[in-house]
Amino acid sequence: APVVAPAPAPAPAPAPAPAPAPTPAPAPVTVAAPKAVEYPLGVTEIVKNDAGTAEFDLFIVHTNDVHARIVPADGGMGYSKLSTMLKMGRALTDNILVLDAGDVTHGTNLANMFEGETVGVLLDMLGYDAVAPGNHDFNYGADRLIEAARFAEEYTDLKVLSANVLDENGYLLFQPYQVYDFNGFKIAVVGLTTPDTATKTHPKNVQGITFANEEIFEIGQMAIDMAKQYVDYVIVLGHIGMDPDGASGLTTDKIVSKIKGIDLFIDGHSHTTLKEGMKIGDTLVVQTGDYMKNLGLVQLHVKNGKVTATYPMLIPAADVLNAKDSALAKQYGITDVPNDPQVDEYVGYMSAQLSQKLNTLVATLPENLDGERANVRTKQTNLSKLITMAMTAESGADFTITNGGGIRASLKAGNVTMGDVINVLPFTNIITVVEVKGSDVYAALEHGYSKLPDQNGAFSQTDLQVVYNRFAAPGKRILRVLLNGKAIDRNATYKVATNDFMAAGGDGYTMFGKVLSEGSLLSDVFIEFLKKNYPVK
């Protein structure tokens, strides 16, 4: 039977009610914002799209080895056109990730004169999500790069990522990875920097820094394994490259073969053009070449948290610069890719600042220095002698061999500006030290002197004493080569300063051996040499 509670005693009559008080306003309701997802090492997830769509296309735009080609140059499209293309893409979808695989901040006067600031601002303006530092991004010194990374972290959405750049105590100098969320589909981007950086920038730029040369596979696998616990897709943004002749011997294919779990490797450093990417095991490797001659695009089709299809491609700069005649552009109904006026305005402003810098006085010369084309391509001149002296002194090499074709103007007696020197040495060449056997020194000079009496851009400018017979048959012209008054030993090995173009076999100098180190810009070194020896009066 149901249990019935006893009836309560009758309540006392209520007291007369007081006058009603005014009804207070309801307290405001505080709604807590969703807590940002945090991952190991203090990494906070970035939500790029939270629409919750289960099936969608994701577009990964990538560049590498732009080397500060800010405006169209050397076959590249420049940042103004790229900005317009990105705006076109973002007008259609929020599912876009923009990444750069390094060597981006150094390489032209518009970047170099401002220690990379011009490029950093442009990367932010264009909405880049992440960049992995390359060896030449250290050319302004590690402190400058670290400062730029911290500035980007505080004031922009750009991340500078590298999981293998360590200080002298073994601590990471950069954020190692970043997680991005597209409709619940999570991507980890892990940065890597080539251990070749130890020798492919001036040693002073990376003093006290290591690149986990021996531990990179272990560190990389740990990073990927950790990422796989939290994300659906792993991208390595690596300035590593395909060149097996690098000082470290570390190449992308070695990393991909030994580190498991990488879905996409966006590569740089070797300036390799992979038109449709390259599969190594289960990993897709992509690289665009250099100077923004191509824009990389990887389209992922995502369904219920899984990638069901991947479409890599390159968009050639020629199709962007001349869209009206491009079959590729016509497929998408594009007839013109105009410049972005905001980018043009900024580049114009910085170009004006550059002009002011180039007017800075650096030296006062007592005499004219001869850089006339017909002379520097057939004989030593007083200008070429000073340039080779500066290269040897800066690099610590035994001597210098550089190409006469790299000297493009003379310097007049009197005041010399920074712009005057850059007119002499306009190619942003980097001083490079190579290992060369004595017999190959003779071979290099024979090559350089082979076209005499005709002019030759490959003519060897050197601070060695060269005794030669210009009328002998090519290949038999060099009689004797002296270093500090002593004959070069054909069986000995020497450290030779040259430029990065020649070290890579440019102008036919294929006899140069292993690269020992890369240093500063040749123009910067010569400016400092003139300042020291011919101060402004």
Predicted regions and their residues:
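Catalytic centers of hydrolytic enzymes
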Residues: Y39-D57, A68-I70, S83, K87-A91, ...
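Gram-positive cell-envelope targeting signals
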Residues: A1-P2, T108
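Acidic, metal/ion-coordinating pockets
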Residues: P34-K324, T378, N382-A390, T400, ...
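Ser/Thr/Gly/Pro-rich low-complexity, disordered linker/stalk segments of secreted
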Residues: P2-L41
